[in-house]
Amino acid sequence: METVGLSRRFTKRYPHEFSGGQRQRIGIARALAVDPEFIVADEPISALDVSIQAQIMNLMEKLQTEKNLTYLFISHDLRAIRHVSDRVAVMYLGKIVELADAKTVYREPLMPYTKALISAVPVPDPQIEAKRTRIILKGDVPSPINPPSGCHFNTRCPYAISECKRIEPSLVEIKPKHYAACIRISPEHAHIEENEKAGLGRVGN
């Protein structure tokens, strides 16, 4: 308990007597009880106040350094992911669509879905923020039980062409250690983009 910043006397309390942040610390303490090397942290800071979120992330970073831990940090909070991650995997409808180190994903996203996500993250500098282009995705997220054929993102992608409905892209290395799943940038399907530029393809959703 003390390892996660809680007093030993808290062991005599009932669950309803703890705050959200304290319950998260207890969850971390339980995970540490088996002396793990790898921890899956699924939305560890969701539903917490911003100040408490920062405390939990700082605690996790501290424990990572002290105990040489590896985290799989699952979250919808893009700012938190950027803060704690060395590598980032972006998922859409249960499939990884981009994978690279965190700095690369945030600075040079390749997959259209990733680009849309990053464009939604506010920048503190108002002058830079004013010049940024927000990518607004149209339509609803399809059901993961019955996803669209081809690329699952094709129904919402602003860059989709007819082939995107037919071909399901693989996660391939586009740049050194930077992987993405998109036939329009994949070296495996270079002929598709060549045909599109030559006017032989057709844009459509």
Question: Where is each model-derived feature located?
Answer:
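Conserved ABC ATPase signature
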Residues: 14-18, 22
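Conserved ABC ATPase "signature" region
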Residues: 1-9, 118-119
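Charged, flexible cofactor/metal-binding loops and thiol motifs
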Residues: 101-204
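Interfacial catalytic loop of ABC nucleotide-binding domains
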Residues: 12-14, 132
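P-loop NTP-binding/switch modules centered on Walker-like glycine-rich loops
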Residues: 40, 44, 48, 52-130
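A short, proline-enriched helix->beta-strand linker immediately N-terminal to the Walker B motif
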Residues: 33-37
